[in-house]
Amino acid sequence: ITDLHQGIIWGTHTPQTERDERLINRFDYDGDYGTVLNRFLMQAAIGYPLTVHGTGGQTRAFIHIRDMVKCVQIALENPPAKGDRVMIFNQMTETHRVRDLAELVAQISGTEYALVPNPRKESAENELHVSNDTFLSLGLEPTKLAEGLLQEVEDVAKKYADRVDRGKIPARSLWTSNQAEGVPENA
């Protein structure tokens, strides 16, 4: 048995999807279910302040869609031997605190970011200690956010900015009655 623990997938294209626009990957940006990176990129594309919940000290793991596909291939080609323990792979290539991710997107896009109340009941700061050494030792050559492919998803956000439902961007589902919506004052 092989168990893949997956980080947040970013990116919209693989070599196969680049052949036909109809094959593009989903790009969920809403505040409740979309990924934080997609939300930041869509906010930047429409001039909406990037919303960082709480302190933004929550650490998340990320992996580009091409690397995710490669990791599945590597896992399939390297199964555990019969009778061995479950093989666990961490399917991620890097980790970032949410506020650092906001700073990266703000720097690339020229957008501001705002700290807003955290609508979730979670620690204000956390460290994510995770390793993908097994994938690296089996040939994964990771794609990092800062290597320019982030431009790929920024371009997708800009291309479809006219389709954005601004009301879906803020996180409005509250985890407890003590939480507040994640809406910036100037949005």
Language-model features, listed with the residues they occupy:
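Conserved beta-loop-beta element that borders a ligand/cofactor-binding pocket
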Residues: 1-27, 51
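Short, flexible micro-motifs
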Residues: 10, 14, 37, 57-59
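Short-chain dehydrogenase/reductase
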Residues: 27-38, 61-62
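Short glycine-rich loop/turn motifs that provide flexible caps or phosphate-binding loops at active sites
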Residues: 6, 10, 33, 46, ...
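C-terminal substrate-binding subdomain of Rossmann-fold SDR/epimerase-dehydratase oxidoreductases
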Residues: 42-187
